[in-house]
Amino acid sequence: MQTELSGRRALVSAERLQAELGHLGVGSDVHAGHGMAMVSVWVGLVVWSDGERFWWRTGWNIEHIRPVYAWHPSTEPRRAARRVARRYASLRER
């Protein structure tokens, strides 16, 4: 039951982020399962949600040999969308 509730929160958060991204002209797809949701934005840009926060990969730490992630509270989907949109723009420039 807890997984269903947290999964529902994750999906609702992801859909709110998707809507805010759409207002910024950034298309995306939402997928959910196993208590999590993800917003697929661009090649190499997937935003995960657990219903409490969003997180996405922003780079690679060569020293620690691992990805670097940014995160944002899911209570602020508009601000998170602006940050994701900036990342999207930087990836498209490559």
Residue ranges and their predicted role:
Residues P67-R94:
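Ampiphathic alpha-helical segments that act as solvent-exposed interaction surfaces
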Residues G44-S74:
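Intrinsically disordered, low-complexity regulatory segments enriched in Ser/Thr/Pro
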